[in-house]
Structure formats: structure tokens, C-alpha cells
Amino acid sequence: MAAVRRRERDVVEENGVTTTTVKRRKMEEEVDLVESRIILSPCVQATNRGGIVARNSAGASETSVVIVRRRDSPPVEEQCQIEEEDSSVSCCSTSEEKSKRRIEFVDLEENNGDDRETETSWIYDDLNKSEESMNMDSSSVAVEDVESRRRLRKSLHETVKEAELEDFFQVAEKDLRNKLLECSMKYNFDFEKDEPLGGGRYEWVKLNP
């Protein structure tokens, strides 16, 4: 009985060894199949640790994909599906293309902003010119008004002065005539005509030079 049990144990151990070796071979075959199925794209680079890393043109790593599967690990999720027919088109967009697109978009916005700025500057220039012309017109009108007022005041002042002078001279002339008349009556001599008057107190004799 003991010998039979030992033989059964030996058979079981041999079966276990064979099953483990078979499992290892199956795992190695699965790994080989997985490695043979994966196609490296231009933006993917293989690593030394049994995986592949997606890289852009600048060399910066973006995503990593492990190609060795284990029994406990979930299936590999394909990050980029590459079609065999159109192998030239890459599904991984590089940072240079993104930066180019972004720069072009910014350039368009800047151009539009420049156009708007030029349009608004033209409008502001027109408004400033119109305001300047209006200010110049108003200033010229104000100057003309001031000049006309000054002329009017000057003319009024001059006319008043002339009238006063005329009145003054008229009064003075009248006074002078009155005085001359009094002198003529007193001295019986006409000073305006430069000849003596008859019938007075004084007798005038003409002297020859």
C-alpha cells in the first residue's frame, strides 16, 4: 500500500511539473503572439523594459503601452489604432502641428485686431480732424466778434469825443465873439474887420509905416 501511494504521489508531481511547463510555454507563446501583432508607428518607440512609448517629434514622452500580458493583468487597451492600408497617416498628432495651428490662429486674431485698430484709429482721426476744424471755426468766429465789438466801441468813443470837441469849440468861439464884441463897443473899434467905429470915446488915427 505504501508503495502504491508513493507511485501516485510521483505521478501527481510529474503531472504538476508538466502542467507548469505547459503553462509557461503557453504564456511565452502568447507573449510572442502579442509582440508579433503590435505594429510600431512613426510616433512610437520601443523601450528596454518590454514596452513601447509614444513620442512626438520633440522627443517628449506622452503615453506608454505595456505589451507583456499576465494572467492577472487586464487586456491591453490600444491607444492608437493604425490602419495597415494607410500606414503613412499617423494617429498621434505632434506638438509642432498643434503649435503651428495655434500660432496661425493667433496670427489671424492679431491681424483682425490690427484691422480693427486701424479702422478705429481712422475713425478717431476723422473725429479729431472734424473737432479741430470746428474749434478753429468757432475760434475764428469768436475773434471776429471780438474785433467787431472793439471797432464798434472805438467808433462810438471817437464819435463821442468829436462831438464833445465840437461843443467845446462852439462854446469857446461864442465866448470869444462876445468878448470881441464887448471890446469893440468899449473901444469903438471892429477887431474882426480891423477898422475904427464912429461915434465912440476913442479916435483912431491910421499910421503909415
From Swiss-Prot:
Its main location: nucleus. Residues 1-32 are annotated as: Required for nuclear localization. Specifically interacts with CDKA-1, but not with CDKB1-1. GO terms for cellular component: nucleoplasm. Induction: Down-regulated by auxin in roots. The keyword Phosphoprotein applies. Belongs to the CDI family. ICK/KRP subfamily. Treatment with auxin induces lateral root initiation. ICK2/KRP2 protein abundance is regulated post-transcriptionally through CDK phosphorylation and proteasomal degradation. One of its GO terms (biological process) is DNA endoreduplication. Binds and inhibits CYCD2-1/CDKA-1 complex kinase activity. Regulates cell division which is crucial for plant growth, development and morphogenesis. May regulate early lateral root initiation by blocking the G1/S phase transition. Controls the mitosis-to-endocycle transition and the onset of the endoreduplication cycle during leaf development through inhibition of mitotic CDKA-1 kinase complexes. Specifically targets CDKA-1. One of its GO terms (molecular function) is cyclin-dependent protein serine/threonine kinase inhibitor activity. Phosphorylated. Keywords: Cell cycle, Nucleus, Phosphoprotein, Protein kinase inhibitor. It comes from the Eukaryota. The keyword Nucleotide-binding does not apply. Pfam families: CDI. This is Cyclin-dependent kinase inhibitor 2. It is found in: Nucleus, Nucleoplasm.
